[in-house]
Amino acid sequence: MSQRITIDPVTRIEGHLRIDCEIENGVVSKAWASGTMWRGMEEIVKNRDPRDAWMIVQRICGVCTTTHALSSVRAAESALNIDVPVNAQYIRNIILAAHTTHDHIVHFYQLSALDWVDITSALQADPTKASEMLKGVSTWHLNSPEEFTKVQNKIKDLVASGQLGIFANGYWGHPAMKLPPEVNLIAVAHYLQALECQRDANRVVALLGGKTPHIQNLAVGGVANPINLDGLGVLNLERLMYIKSFIDKLSDFVEQVYKVDTAVIAAFYPEWLTRGKGAVNYLSVPEFPTDSKNGSFLFPGGYIENADLSSYRPITSHSDEYLIKGIQESAKHSWYKDEAPQAPWEGTTIPAYDGWSDDGKYSWVKSPTFYGKTVEVGPLANMLVKLAAGRESTQNKLNEIVAIYQKLTGNTLEVAQLHSTLGHIIGRTVHCCELQDILQNQYSALITNIGKGDHTTFVKPNIPATGEFKGVGFLEAPRGMLSHWMVIKDGIISNYQAVVPSTWNSGPRNFNDDVGPYEQSLVGTPVADPNKPLEVVRTIHSFDPCMACAVHVVDADGNEVVSVKVL
């Protein structure tokens, strides 16, 4: 018998997302992903100076702020053919790597972990046994019986008070929760420790960016960070050493806690290495430029089709015509006019709401395609592209997670299993581990270049008063490939479009009626209790949705009431 469930809104994400599923014999047979806000930021920046756009568009989201700012700056620099000083590139790279580290840690612990961890079960744990379980896989100094006892007492106090606070909402006791009490206790302890680690990542961003969220140091042509090692109120030696101290602390947590916890979750939920397979076409752009023209990068980019790593096609730069010409957005199933596929430079954002319809329009998110195909972007795509490109560091980081998984289970983990819900999470962890190397590398590069006497961080842009210029700023954001598309005419912005990662992944059916990545990933998912569809939420959360980026403007009521309807 067929059932219909609606989860509206999906919580523990950024923004507003509705998921509808049809369930046949306890398994999802069809799914619809609906963004329930409209983003009009593109309209706001029209007729403005292109140098102002980055400051405005980073307000698209309070989480992904840095990435939108940097992508917008790159778009303007692309349009105006500006060479960026390498010191500015190093500073931007450090900010991006720290921001992404923060984002990945927040996702795993605060947004996703509670889909796998039963908080109440931790009350039955033995703190000493929990500590013993981690010996041989982690040297983290807070994995002690004393620390786990403190955390357990905190949980007891919350339960006794009748107010669970941040742990108030969850499917505790759900039959799909499988972790032993000790592992649940470990996870809760690391959840709380991650809050402090996030602060260290944000300190790196704020020390260079002026503040976070919404950094202030970017400029079309570089960064507003004057360098003088002996000066005051500038980027001096003392501030650089302070930044380095936080970079080192981040690396310890990522390697000894985050990486281990990922392997532990996979070890106890191996069936989720076979569920959640999405679009299986993967797209990622090169990132962390080391030259002034965004032509040389530390991370490679590329495209993989139909889950076949041998189909890998490299994307070598942000001006790669193969990449630029392949991207279109359609609105056949979105609440906009102009339904046919459009290239972003010619894209329109004219709302046309006419109600929710299974076979018609049902989302404020557009549907992007790459040469007509639905693709997935994000850390899984990024990892698979780097594996296909033969990047040794990526393989090594993945091998480290697999080794822990193998030690816990006695089983190996193959690349084919990564096209899955847990594959998204593993890809994000691999990315975060690699980012620690990027932070160290780019910090050293900055110090070395300053030592050579190069203190340049900005070149003044020349914006012609007449003529039309097009630019695109690509960026590998925490959730995947981000692009801002800018058209400058007679010195001001005449058109602007942002094609964001969660648009690629949460998009509705495209112009050819092919389902989007979220929708495809849910098909075949078993649901034990339609009133508590934890399994559906697990897969959606594994993508780390940011609907505030994908769409933008709340409804008139502004109510945030979670409901699960079973029809």
What is each of the regions a protein language model found here?
Residues 494:
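Catalytic-core signal marking the mid-to-C-terminal active-site face
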Residues 1-479, 489-490, 500-567:
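Active-site bordering "gate/hinge" segments
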